[in-house]
Regions:
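An N-terminal domain-start capping segment
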Residues: 1-2, 125
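Anionic-ligand-binding alpha/beta catalytic cores of soluble enzymes and soluble regulatory domains
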Residues: 2-78
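Fold-independent oxyanion-binding glycine-rich loops
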Residues: 12, 105-106, 141
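Glycine-rich active-site loops that engage anionic ligands at enzyme catalytic sites
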Residues: 70-129
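Conserved "cap/hinge" positions at secondary-structure junctions
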Residues: 124, 140-142
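Loop/turn positions that initiate beta-strands
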Residues: 133-138
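Short, Lys/Arg- and Gly-enriched loop/turn segments at beta-strand edges
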Residues: 143-149
């Protein structure tokens, strides 16, 4: 068990950002969900309204006491309400650190667009020229979550 690991940026489904052509959420899921999170006390305006997907293999995220957990978020009519947790994190890229959040839609309430168990979705400020294949170092608050193999 650890609270820090290196991972590789991987392509996501494009649904969170609204880039997926076949998505019913043209604005992007994060943009649609943000007002619901704000109403529950979490402001996302410091972050790009898209996720950075990082494969931490062989590590996978295990929630402990996330900073925020919101149950039964009714953000769309396309599917039933979802539960989301957010874990505070720091990401280091080329020696520069930025604060962000692990965005964790609970798989048991997420009807589609599942990620492999070793992939975490991050909400971060815009990182210039970030590309798939880049290595990032993820640091979690160990009280909120851990990484296990």
């Amino acid at each position: 068990m650890t609270a820090s690991a290196t991972g590789v940026v991987v392509a996501g489904h494009g649904v969170a950002s609204g880039r997926a052509g076949d998505s019913p959420f043209a604005a992007g899921t994060i943009e649609l969900q943000a007002p619901h999170f704000r109403a529950r006390g979490l402001e996302l305006s410091a972050y790009l309204l898209a996720t950075v997907n990082v494969d931490l293999a062989p590590w996978r995220l295990v929630l402990r006491q996330p900073r925020w957990t919101f149950a039964d978020v009714e953000w769309t009519r396309v599917h039933p309400p979802e539960t989301f947790s957010f874990v505070e994190c720091t990401v280091t890229r080329d020696g520069a650190a930025v604060d962000g959040l692990v965005y964790h839609p609970h798989p048991e309430t997420k009807p589609m667009h599942h990620q492999p168990s070793t992939v975490v979705e991050l909400l971060l400020p815009r990182l210039a020229a970030l590309a798939t294949g880049e290595e990032l170092w993820l640091h979690l608050d160990p009280r909120q979550a851990a990484l296990v193999t």
